Regions:
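Juxtamembrane intracellular "pre-TM" segments in multi-pass secondary transporters
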Residues: 29-32, 246-294, 318
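Extracytoplasmic gate region of multi-pass secondary transporters
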Residues: 57-58, 287-343, 398-402, 406, ...
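Primarily marks hydrophobic transmembrane alpha-helices of the MFS/SLC 12-helix fold
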Residues: 108, 154, 358-364
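Symmetry-related core transmembrane helices of the 12-TM Major Facilitator Superfamily/SLC fold
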Residues: 218-235, 474-492
Length: 506
C-alpha cells in the first residue's frame, strides 16, 4: 500500500463477500469476555516485572560508581543502559515479524525467561574482567570514549536483558489489541502501560533496599527470579484470532477463547503472511499518523530515559539525599504519579475521542507541553520542598501520553502488521531516543567535570544551576529540550489528522 492509497475500511473490505460479516460500528460496544481481563492481568504482571529488572541498574548505579573494584565512570553507566536498548532495538523487527506469524504467548514466555536469567547474571558480570578495554577518540568534538573490560562485560550482559525485553514489548500490544475492542482498547493499553511506571517505581525501591542491605550484586540476582516463575502463566495463555475484536463475528468468537486451543501458526498463504518484510516496513513507514506519532514519542522517550537512568545519582550527588532515601522517595513518586498519568491518559483519551477525531494526538501534545516547566523545576531547585513536588507533577504529565500514543500506533496500521509496527516503533524510539540520551548525559557529565562544553555550563549558571559542582544536572538539560521537540511533533500530528480514526484490516 502506498501512502497515496486510501486504506479500505472494514465495511469496504467485506462488501460483496457474503462469507464475511460487516464491521461492527464503534457505537455497538461489544462486551469484553472475562478471559480478556485475565490475559491482560497476566501480561501486565510480567510487564511490571520486566521494568523492575530494567530499572535495577539505575537504582544501584550510585553503589556501582562508588565500588572501588569496578572503577566505573558516569559514561560507563550510560553505555550499559545504551547496550540494553540497542540490543532491544536491533532485534525488535525480527520479533515483530515472528509475532505476526507465530503464536505470540509462547514467544513472550520465552522472552521472559531470557531477560530474567540475564538480569540475575548481571550480578556476576564483573567476574569477567579479562575482557579488553576500548578507546575511541572523536576529534570533531574532542572527546575520547573509553570503556574498561569490567564495564564491557556488564554491557554484554545488559544487552542480553534487552534481547528478552525486545521480544516481549514488541509482541504484547498486538495481542492485547486482539483481546479488546476499539472502544476499550486505549484503556486496556493504559493498564498494560501502567506497569511501566509501577515497575520503574518498585525497581527503585527494591533495587535500592537490596543494594543497601546485601550489595548491588545480590540485588540483580534476586530480582531476576520472579520473571522465571511468571513466564509459565504467559506460556499457558490462549490466543484469540488476529483481528478478533475488529468484526462482529470475531467479537463473538472471542468469548470462546478460554475454551479454545492456542492459536496455531498461520499458513504462508494467509492474509498478509506472504508480504515481504521490506514491503511491510514500507507500508508502515508510509503511514503518516504512525510516523509523526513515533517521531514525537522518540523525543519524549529521550527525555524520560535520561531521567530514568540518572535520577537517583542526581538526587544523591547533586541534591544531597542518601541513596536509600532517594530510591524509596523516587519509587513512591514514580508509582503514584506514573500510574495516575498512564491510567488517566487512557481514560481521558477515550472520552475526548468521542468528540474529537484527533484526541489522542492532542492529549499527547498538551500533557508533554505542560510537563516542561516542572521538569526544569526538578533540575534548577535545590530545596526538596520544590524539586520533589515538581518530580511528581512532571512524571504524571509525561506518562499521560503512554496509552493514547500506543492507541495511535495500533489503530493507524493494518491488523496483520501490528506487531511489526510496534517493533519498528521500538527501533526508532530507542535507537534515536533514550539509547542516545542515556549515554550522552553520562559522557556530557564526565566532559563537564573536565571543563569542556563551556557554553552549556554558562547557560546552566544563568538559570540557577551550579554547573561546576552539578555537572550531571547540567547534562540533564537535554531533557526539557527534547520535550519541546516532542510537543511540537504531537501538535503537528493533531493538525494533520483530518479523517476519523478507524481500525484497518490487512
Amino acid at each position: 500500500m502506498s501512502r497515496h492509497d486510501k486504506p479500505a475500511t472494514n465495511v469496504e473490505a467485506t462488501a460483496g463477500q457474503g462469507r464475511h460479516p460487516p464491521a461492527v460500528p464503534r457505537h455497538s460496544n461489544p462486551a469484553v469476555p472475562r478471559y480478556s481481563y485475565y490475559a491482560l492481568a497476566v501480561l501486565s504482571l510480567v510487564n511490571f516485572l520486566n521494568y523492575i529488572d530494567r530499572q535495577v541498574l539505575p537504582a544501584v548505579a550510585n553503589s556501582m560508581l562508588n565500588d572501588p573494584a569496578l572503577k566505573l565512570t558516569d559514561a560507563d553507566i550510560g553505555y550499559m543502559e545504551a547496550s540494553l536498548l540497542l540490543s532491544f532495538t536491533v532485534l525488535a523487527p525480527l520479533f515483530g515479524r515472528l509475532g505476526d506469524r507465530h503464536p505470540r504467548a509462547k514467544l513472550m514466555a520465552s522472552a521472559a525467561v531470557i531477560w530474567s536469567f540475564a538480569t540475575a547474571l548481571t550480578g556476576l558480570a564483573d567476574r569477567f574482567s579479562f575482557m579488553p578495554s576500548l578507546n575511541l577518540h572523536l576529534p570533531v568534538i574532542n572527546i575520547t570514549l573509553a570503556i574498561s573490560g569490567v564495564a564491557l562485560a556488564l554491557c554484554a550482559v545488559r544487552a542480553c536483558v534487552g534481547v528478552g525485553e525486545s521480544a516481549y514489548s514488541t509482541i504484547t500490544p498486538s495481542l492485547i489489541a486482539d483481546f479488546f475492542p476499539p472502544h476499550r482498547r486505549a484503556t486496556a493499553l493504559g493498564v498494560f502501560q501502567a506497569a511501566i511506571p509501577m515497575g520503574f517505581a518498585l525497581g527503585f525501591v527494591i533495587g535500592g533496599v537490596l543494594a543497601h542491605f546485601f550489595g548491588w550484586r545480590v540485588a540483580f540476582m534476586l530480582v531476576g527470579v520472579p520473571g522465571l516463575l511468571t513466564a509459565v502463566l504467559v506460556w499457558r495463555l490462549r490466543e484469540p484470532a488476529r483481528g478478533a475484536t475488529e468484526t462482529e463475528a470475531h467479537a463473538s468468537s472471542l468469548e470462546e477463547v478460554a475454551a479454545a486451543p492456542a492459536e496455531a501458526p498461520r499458513s504462508p498463504d494467509s492474509s498478509g503472511a506472504n508480504e515481504s518484510t521490506l514491503r511491510t516496513v514500507w507500508r508502515i513507514l508510509s503511514t503518516r499518523d504512525w510516523l509523526v506519532s513515533t517521531a514525537g514519542y522518540t523525543a519524549l522517550t529521550a527525555a524520560l530515559g535520561a531521567f530514568a537512568t540518572w535520577a537517583i545519582v542526581v538526587l544523591v550527588r547533586d541534591k544531597g539525599m542518601d541513596e536509600t532515601s532517594a530510591n524509596i522517595t523516587l519509587g513512591v513518586i514514580t508509582l503514584l504519579a506514573g500510574a495516575t498519568g498512564t491510567f488517566g491518559g487512557g481514560w481521558l483519551a477515550d472520552r475526548v475521542a468521542a468528540r474529537r477525531h484527533n484526541a489522542y494526538f492532542l492529549v499527547c501534545a498538551v500533557s508533554t507541553l505542560a510537563g516542561i516547566v516542572p521538569t526544569l523545576g526538578v533540575l534548577v531547585a535545590d530545596d526538596a520542598r520544590i524539586y520533589l513536588p515538581c518530580t511528581f507533577l512532571a512524571v504524571t504529565l509525561l506518562f499521560t501520553s503512554n496509552a493514547p500514543f500506543h492507541a495511535i500506533l495500533l489503530e493507524s496500521v493494518p491488523v496483520r502488521v501490528r506487531a511489526m509496527a510496534v517493533a519498528l516503533n521500538i527501533v526508532i524510539i530507542h535507537a534515536c531516543g533514550d539509547a542516545i540520551s542515556r549515554a550522552t548525559v553520562g559522557v556530557l557529565s564526565d566532559s563537564l567535570k573536565q571543563g569542556q562544553f563551556a557554553a552549556l555550563a554558562s547557560f546552566a549558571r544563568a538559570i540557577g544551576i551550579d554547573a561546576g559542582r552539578q555537572h550531571l544536572t547540567t547534562a540533564l538539560l537535554l531533557a526539557p529540550a527534547a520535550l519541546a521537540v516532542s510537543t511540537t511533533l504531537f501538535f503537528v500530528g493533531a493538525r494533520l489528522q483530518k479523517r476519523p480514526r478507524r481500525a484497518i484490516e490487512g
